[in-house]
Amino acid sequence: MAKAKYERTKPHLNIGTIGHIDHGKTTLTAAITKTLSQVGGAKATSYEEIDKAPEERERGITINTSHVEYQTETRHYAHVDCPGHADYIKNMITGAAQMDGSILVVSAADGPMPQTREHILLSRQVGVPYIVVFMNKIDMVDDPELLELVEMEVRELLSFYEFPGDDIPVLMGSALKALECGCGTRECEWCKHIWELMDAVDSYIPLPQRAVDKPFLMPIEDVFTITGRGTVTTGRVERGQVKVGDEVEIVGMREATRKTVCTGVEMFRKLLDYAEAGDNIGTLLRGVDRKEVERGMVLAKPGSIKPLTAFNAEVYVLTKEEGGRHTPFFGGYRPQFYFRTTDVTGIIQLPEGVEMVMPGDNVQMAIELITPIAIEEGLRFAIREGGRTVGAGVVTSLNE
């Protein structure tokens, strides 16, 4: 069969395997690449290659992650797999590997285990929107009733964490058997399960909304005055687009927001009619004094984001080896929170029953900032102390 070339026309999604240690995440990842390689949709990647995940650094945190890519008839996927449990936690909290959906791998022989639960909870907290389940190792289970029982348990667990447990596709198979066979046909006793899984991923996980289609937001990095023209703010457009003549809202660093009109957009010293997600631009703002705008604020579509001081977050605390703290911290701890372009002091409140947080822990916490910031669910931040990063977090809910 002729080798399929990489068609850029296919929509792209980011997915990953999650689940308890030794339930077969990496074997499944290898089996997917092996199966799809038979039809030119992937380069077969061995278990060993995926398992020796290279170290990456995201916001100063060391994470081991493996990336493979493959395509089905309709889509192109980038797939992440992590060797260690801690790597998943760091990945999900820092957003190093943003997932549009994930494949939860559960061993049919063992059923849901502590990390199964933790990965589902983290997916809920950090906003992984869709989960497809692969019940693995069915070659080790003789009793069909046991399979039903495990499926029921998994569905209940998903529902408990507010995923649609009754509607989520649950596929069954043996990643190892499919990998060992490797014929990749839909008729094969073992390889067909990999195809069933990919069909479910294709149909159940929807295409993500593109950044450019979301409401406009640009973190302000710098502000200056152009004599005779007015105040210019510069920054990189995070999402959406802005056209000359659009009304925008200045949000953050103050209780009140301020609406103004964008009267000019320029990039690389050229004037534009509009700018969109990913562009580094300068925006001219009508009637705004230079003293009214500062780094740390954002320009946004009016009404799309509010300045807030109180929110809940899921946080990973760096280990001493990662350059973090050497000692635990307690409730009432007052570090700096770095959002987008600026540091703001905040006070940490730990959940009931949690006395202290050790380096290397991940924890849910409530945070009260001393200055309002434009905050929304899913926003990532770093926790800093004396200029060094000691934690990474993601906003899970707002306390207005």
UniProtKB/Swiss-Prot annotation:
GO terms for cellular component: cytosol. Disulfide bonds: none annotated. It is an enzyme of class 3 (hydrolase). PROSITE patterns: G_TR_1, G_TR_2. Residues 174-176 are annotated as: G5. Residues 136-139 are annotated as: G4. One of its GO terms (molecular function) is GTPase activity. Residues 10-209 form the tr-type G domain. Residues 19-26 are annotated as: G1. Residues 81-84 are annotated as: G3. The keyword Magnesium applies. It comes from the Bacteria. The keyword Disulfide bond does not apply. Its EC number is 3.6.5.3. Mg(2+) binds at residue 26. InterPro entries: EF-Tu_GTP-bd, EF-Tu_GTPase, EFTu-like_2, EFTU_2, G_TR_CS, P-loop_NTPase, Small_GTP-bd, T_Tr_GTP-bd_dom. GTP binds at residues 19-26, 81-85, 136-139. It is found in: Cytoplasm. Monomer. This is Elongation factor Tu 2.
